[in-house]
Amino acid sequence: MEQPSSRLPFFTRIGTRVIYHLYITDTVVNYTGKARPAMAINGSIPAPVLTFTEGDSAEIYVHNLSMMETSIHWHGILLPNRYDGVSYLTTAPIEMGGTHYYTFPIKQNGTYWYHSHTMMQQQSGMYGAIVIHKKNEPRAKEHTLLLSDWTDENPEEVDRSLHNATDWYGIRKGSTQSYAEAIREGHFKTKIVNEWKRMNAMDVSDVYYDHFFSNGKPENHAMGFKAGDTVKLRVVNGSSSTYFWLNYGGGKITVVANDGKDVEPVVVDRLLIAVSETYDVLVVIPENKNYAFTATAEDRTKSTTLWLGMGEKVAADTMGRLKYFEGMKMMNDMMKMNGEMNDMGMKMSLQKMDMNTVMYPEAGGTKEIVTLNYAMLKSTEKTTLPDAPTKTFTFNLSGNMNRYVWTIDNKTVSEADKIMIKKGENVRIIVYNGTMMRHPMHLHGHFFRVLNGQGDYAPLKNVLDIMPMETDTLEFAATESGDWWFHCHILYHMMSGMGRLFSYEGSPVNPEIGDPVKALKKVYADDRKFHAMAKLGLESNGSDGELQFANTRWQLQAEWRIGLTKENGYETEIHAGRYLGKMQWLYAYAGFDIRHRKMEEPEKDLFGNINTKDDRKVFCIGAEYTLPMLVKAGARFDTDCKLRLQLGREDVPVSKRLRFNFMANTDKEYMVGFRYVVTKYISLSTHYDSDMGLGAGITITY
């Protein structure tokens, strides 16, 4: 591997030419007492800040010294399509040992950032800030703050776990919302209604994080400020999936720019910065003390702080634990039995009505808290579009939290056609969020107007946070060429397929990506990926288990039970099938069933027929449907002309770590059991099986 001493200088300026050399390497970090693999740029996480002045010409060499291909996307930067940095869509991937050269004119100013757009590399450390100064701009007192999230887990393992509906992250965060917790907090009915409507525990975030960082540290310091200074903070949310509440121990926050674009100053007590957004804010240092600018994760599990100034520390207001059952009660009212949201006659948009307020402990206090919303943002200059034909699209953000499927109009990127637009026309997008989570929707290569009631001065953005049940309208002038991604910037939602590709008609293909058909298949591969899940019970009465491979629609599943005696016998079922419907409550499958158990006399099933459950080799077809209370109802018919009906459920949350399972069918088989979660992969378990009897031991879950 190339040694650092042989590297070219990080920064060189020759007139208006600004040249950077970025070196991507694999590295090892230790943030929690455990060494973990990561990826760094020029040896640091976050990557170094890239600084330009409007009118410069950027020349950036990205050298890949890591052990995998990579990419760099210049988030919010207006540039030629071939340099946008999405591997196989706009730009060739940077292969191991390779170098990619980017060059583009700097024709904007503001706060932006850059990050990998390959697999889960952003979560592993590949992100950095970009600062573009205005021409002849007086240098103010300022500081760049890049916020991020960190997990010791391999991000690929996080993604796999989310797709397998693990509640381990809920256990770690204290957001399980079990029946014991519901009873203790007087919300037993709330929990029943929640599961009656086929919902799992509600949360505001998906992943448990070990740390949140301010410029790479849980606490960081900017000491060069004194009493009376007004400090401009350029805040970048470079996290993979965390929204942050921003508040300041020294008083009010004045917002002066969003996503790199200036807005009329807005004074607030706090603001929520969405994943991938940037804000420029002004704060005043009241006295010669050390004031906290704190970013608290939206789920309020942890926070990170940048200390401004020197001397006695002055903390920002702490944000209390969320009242999850109050949120669950609200969500019950908004959710219909068919899984769709009911706005109850409220027309919500622009973050003006935060439905999560019922969960905020501070909401009932006497202090009035001014929180930023998009309706407050007004551009400092007119942003009207040119007079041109307008093409309108309506998008419904959709998803299935139980199976971790995130879509637009119930289709992933790979399932939908490209959206064709023409250069010279205006494009309007009406977006409705029909899911229970917020989504920060990012458009590559363009700024869009957010229609927020400010008329000609509607703010320009490249990321729009859309809350549940909100409808927002954005519009932009189609002035580019090529393919541009519009996607949710929560990394795990994007990789699941929540996005669309806007494609300019008649655009040439970048020859660097090779065969465009093969290249596009690689783009689509992300949301077509199969994820593995396994469960192995090792108990005193035998072993039972499950192995599963599934993606957005399809699933291959094998189940088995092996007793310790001939009387206990063995059985296995293997099914391949497809999930159907928007909520994927229906699963249709085909497969086979092989089993044998030594019995003295044949039994009959509930239909009065000779029961073949103890000696069976059959092919079968069937379906499984999720009923209220998340009970799975199954019906299957086999080549022996036998019908079997079945009811069951796994992982009823009795307490924070205790789970209850049950199953019964018309073959007169039944099972009841408990599982106590010790770690993510190990549980203590016990169950009674009608064929295998009572057993106890451990269950290994992957």
Where are the model-predicted features located?
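Outer-membrane beta-barrel translocator domains and adjoining extracellular loop/strand segments
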Residues: G85-S87, I408, D456, G569-I574, ...
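Outer-membrane beta-barrel initiation region
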Residues: Y504-T565, K598, K617-I621, Y670, ...
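Intrinsic, low-complexity N-terminal interaction/targeting segments
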Residues: T254-V255, G260, I408, D417-K418, ...
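A structural feature that tracks compact, well-ordered secondary-structure segments
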Residues: M223, R234-G238, Y243-G251, L271, ...
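Histidine-centered copper-binding motifs that mark active-site loops
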Residues: M1-V275, V281, K313-M353, A363, ...
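Outer-membrane beta-barrel "beta-signal"
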Residues: V672-V677, S690-Y702
